[in-house]
Structure formats: C-alpha cells, structure tokens
C-alpha cells in the first residue's frame, strides 16, 4: 500500500496503469481535482485539459503507440505539455501525494509457504528469506519481476502446485542473489525446483535438499503429460547453495515434470552446482542457455525422456565439469523408463585448455540419448565419454550420434576421446563410432565458432561455417521442433538477430 498523502481519496496509484490506461488516469485525476490541495487541483485540471485520451506507454512489448493525427504545431504543444506538465503531475501527485515511490519497486519479503493462488506483480521486487514451498496453488510471476534469494533460500514448487513465470523478451523474470551487484557469487541462494507427476524410474523419488521426512519433496507418477507450469524468458543467477557437504542445489531442478510443462528461453548463470538437472519426467527444453556452471551444465537421471532444441552451453575456464552428464539409474542400469533424451541444434563450448579442463558429454549407468546437429567445440579432455554397457544401447537404437561438428577437441584438437584403454565401457570404441561415415559427423582441428565465443561478458555463439557447408539432419516432424533448422548448432548462421537477444545477461558478480 501507499501512505496517505495530501489527497484522501487516492490511497495508491499504479504508475504503469496510469500511463497505459486513459480511463484509469482520468479517474485518478478527477479524484485529485476534487479532493487534493489547491496546487494539485490546478495541476490535475491542466493535464485533463490537454489529455487526448490516448495511452502514454505501450501495453505490451509488441504494441506500438500510434501518433495522434494532429497538426505539427498542436503535436509540439501536446508533447511539450507531456514534458512540462504530465511529468510533474506524475512526480507530484503520484510520489508526493500518495507516496508512490514506496509502491513501485517496493521490496516484498517472502518467508511463508504459498498455499493459495498468488501473483507476484510487475514493478516489485520479492526477497526469499528461506526455502519457500508452493503447495496446492499456482504462483504467477509477471514480466519484469526480480526475485532475490537470501542465503539458504530457495523456491520449491511441489507436485500439487504450478509455477507460471512468464517474462518477456524486454522484461524477463530474474531470480538472483539478494546481495548487491559486485558482491554476488555462485551459491548465494538455492535455486528453483519444480516437482511433478510424470514417470521416474527411482522408487519413492524425492528431491535433494528437502528433509527425508518431508513429503513435499516427493515427486513422480504415471502422468507423462503432467504440467509443472511455465518458465519462459527467465534468468536464474548465482544459485546453488550447499545443502550439506558436497551436495548443492542446482540452478533449475525439474523432478518428474511432464510434457505439458513449458521451459523456454531460460538462462542459468554462474550456478554453484549443475545449471539444469532433470530427474525423470518427459519435460522438453527450448532456447536454453547455461553459462559458467561450476559442475555440469545439463544433467539428467532416473529416466528423463524429454526433447531439447536450441541449447547453448558456455563453460568458463576456471570452473565446471561436463557440459552434459547423463545417467539412467545407478542402482539398476536397465531401469525403465530409460533415460533417452533427444537433442537437436545444440552448441557446446568448453573454453579449450585451461586450469579446469572439461568434457563435453558423459553417458553412463545405462543412459541412452539422441544427439544431432550439434557443435561440440574446444573441449580439452574429450568430446564424448561413454561408460558401462554401450554396445547394446547402440544396437537397440537407444543411443544415436550423427550430423555433428566436433571441432578443436582433445590435446591435439582432432580427438574425441582421451585414451580408449581408460574407458569403462566394455570395449566400446567411441572414436570409431563417431567417425563412421554413415553417421556424417565432422571432426576438425580448427574451432567452429567465432572468436567472441570466449568472452564471459558479451559472448556470441554464431558458427563460422555457412549453412551450405554444414551437414545437418532435418529435425523430426513434431509441434515442438523447428523443422527448418537445417544447420548445426543453436544459432542460425544466416540470422541477423537471435533468440538470445535482449533478455540474457552475463554479470560477473
């Protein structure tokens, strides 16, 4: 609420609505004219006399205000009055009269669990004081909202609830540290956890970070189409506090989320543990960016069978492990449903030789997967490491790897593995498999990405090669996939703008 001011009939004023909605603006000004101080009454009358009844700000990022069909002289007078009259009215009537500055951009502290439908509104900041559970309710987060996590905090959306974090290209939802810019670091807070009712292959599955006797951490079921909600145009920064020794939360955790969950245009930046981890489920990911994760960038376990298109992993030189780490089930490698995700149009960048060297893809414990139209670039250890039983997975078509560009990997730049004798995969030879002519993979020494990919503050992920020079596979015919993406990597070489523009960010701290 806004403090009472010099106009008793105006309890509070919403600035965005005032600018966007002429009827609302007129109502506020009429109340000020009727009940305000003489000075404010005069200001209200003057602005009403010059107001042409049009919105003063677009209602959405896609809407453009149309110019009023007036003469140039009248238009100059109208905009002059906006500058000289409307702004003081907003500044005086809204800020002085109603204490508006305490309303817009106010900080709302959250400590209690959410058990009824709740909206976190644009123009506000919300601070998580501890681990907040959403149970049996929908939490809606409007575009432009910033959620700051204090040490030890996290947002856990249980399987009985849904999260609708719908940002926009120009107003993303941002989950970040509560510390001031310049003082933020990995692990400042926990992260975002979504739990659902889709199949997992682990009995009595429960999420890490929730006490064993707390049933709110349970997830999984039989509903392959279950929805955990929508996370769209959203950034998650500086997450991953240590729950207990060597066990941290991920930036984004998806446990048993089904195919009706929408995870699209999401960046996870500088997480202390994994960027995104799936525990079973059938959730799909699209337009995903993971930058500077301190462990794996994308991790999966317990039977995840989702699809991914347009994903970028940028691993920083000083931290991180694998770009992808895929497991099925450590207790039973053949557990069903088997982990078998599908990837198209992915860029993995490993930063080359550095203090912390990386591996692009590690598959183990029975995980299958399908990897196509990928650029795997600058991994000092190796591009692919398979462990445990692999030959059977390839034979049953549960593991495929084709039409990929492998560039500048290994010690000499042209290897896909470190040393075949070191692999615990019962003699499966990744090198020979990848180089099989029928798979149409390309292995080259020189990098396949532009030099700016090395930047940690303003990276670009456009490939060097043209579309014509690429050997790509057409994505499957399905509503989820963009079938026109006949190129390798997550960024169209021909595009002048990309899906990364406007909403992503790369703060160091």
Feature names for model-found ranges:
Residues 1-31:
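Eukaryotic low-complexity, mixed-charge intrinsically disordered interaction/regulatory segments enriched
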Residues 12-17, 43-47, 206, 246:
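Short coil/turn segments at secondary-structure boundaries
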Residues 29-53:
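Short, charged early-sequence alpha-helical segments and their helix-coil boundaries
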Residues 49-76:
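N-terminal intrinsically disordered, acidic low-complexity segments at the extreme N-terminus
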Residues 67-74, 88, 95-146:
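N-terminal domain-start segments of secreted/luminal proteins
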Residues 76-88:
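N-terminal Sec-pathway targeting helices
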Residues 80-83, 99, 480, 508:
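Intrinsically disordered, low-complexity serine/proline/glycine/threonine-rich regulatory regions
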Residues 105-121, 128-138, 152-160, 167, ...:
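Extracellular beta-rich repeat passengers
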